[in-house]
Amino acid sequence: MEIFGNVVSGLGEGRFFVGLTPYKNKFEELTGFIPFEGTLNVKLKHNFNLDNFNPIEFDGFEINGKRYFGGKVLLIKLFNKHGNFVNCAIVAPKKTDHSKKTLEIIAPIQLRKFLSLNNSNVVKIVI
């Protein structure tokens, strides 16, 4: 399946959460890559239901009495307008401030830099 969306700025929280060792280790286990510390946010025209694609669920954890929630991961390919792509994953935390129209994507590299992406650029996601 192919879906299209626009690159948008995030809240800056992806860098913090992806950088936490338990998340980083879990993402490596589930995706096969060590994620770059940050996410690429992609806004869709319609709500996206990750559960329609059999995502992999992961549990939360606790650090120094603070609870961090689990979520779901779905492996994808992300393409820029030139057809260049990166194997990555959609991450859907159980607790998020994003709408169901915004996807958070992790990858082993900085996607904006590697795929020359700026806000409003259209990307293709292949599931």
Swiss-Prot record:
Reactions this protein catalyses: riboflavin + CTP = CDP + FMN + H(+)
Cofactor binding mode and count: Binds 1 Mg(2+) ion per subunit.
The keyword Magnesium is assigned to this record: yes
Annotated pathway: Cofactor biosynthesis; FMN biosynthesis; FMN from riboflavin (CTP route): step 1/1
InterPro entries in the record: Archaeal_Riboflavin_Kinase, RibK_CTP-dep, Riboflavin_kinase_archaeal, Riboflavin_kinase_CTP-dep, Riboflavin_kinase_dom_sf
Keyword Transferase applies: yes
Binding positions (CDP): 10-15, 109-112
A molecular-function term among this protein's GO annotations: magnesium ion binding
Enzyme class: transferase
Keyword annotations: Flavoprotein, FMN, Kinase, Magnesium, Metal-binding, Nucleotide-binding, Transferase
Gene Ontology biological-process entries: FMN biosynthetic process; riboflavin biosynthetic process
Pfam families: CTP-dep_RFKase
Residues reported to bind Mg(2+): 39, 41
Residue numbers binding FMN: 96, 104
EC number: 2.7.1.161
Entry-linked Gene3D superfamilies: Riboflavin kinase-like
The protein's required cofactors: Mg(2+)
Family: Belongs to the archaeal riboflavin kinase family.
Functional note: Catalyzes the CTP-dependent phosphorylation of riboflavin (vitamin B2) to form flavin mononucleotide (FMN).
Record protein name field: Riboflavin kinase
Name of encoding gene: ribK
